[in-house]
Amino acid sequence: MNALGLGQTYTVSARFDKAVKLIRGALFAMELSVVGEVDTSGTFARENGKKTEPAKILLVDCPLMVFEAQALDRAAGVFFPLHVLVWGDGDRTHVSTVSSGELFDLRLPLGAAGPMERLQARVVMALESVSGSKDGGRGVDCIRPEGPK
């Protein structure tokens, strides 16, 4: 199970704290809610003794989509919210999305599939909308998708 290999990964040309603010603003503009946040700094250290970079998991949902999914199938609620992984890498920040269904290779209940697809699409649009903003007026795109590794 590799969470980072599942979804599209983006790179933000900003330090971690600024990137998190940009991402939160873009999600809010798409009428999405960050219902929870888990600080995972130090959890994924690559080497012992090396300073760990900051990392967070933002739990993102849209109450209307969750309501729709649960109205069609009450079991659908366990697949929400969507996990947005954000981790620092020096002057850059990486962002990736992972849903519970993708993480464990599960087929979503019929009632959850449509709302989850729409939620994922809105999160992707929010992340891509940040690419239109400029970093400090220098004309540098703040976020761009990374290619396959």
Show where each model-derived region lies.
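Short Gly/charged-rich anion-binding patches and loops
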Residues: 21-22, 39, 72, 122
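Short secondary-structure transition/capping segments
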Residues: 77-92, 128-139
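Well-ordered alpha/beta subsegment
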Residues: 106-147
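A generic structural signal for alpha-helix starts
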Residues: 14-18, 64, 114
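Beta-strand/loop substructures that line and gate deep hydrophobic ligand-binding cavities in soluble
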Residues: 82-109
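Terminal, regulation- and interaction-focused segments at domain boundaries
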Residues: 1-30, 34-36, 132-136, 140-149
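Compact, glycine-rich, soluble single-domain proteins
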Residues: 35-82
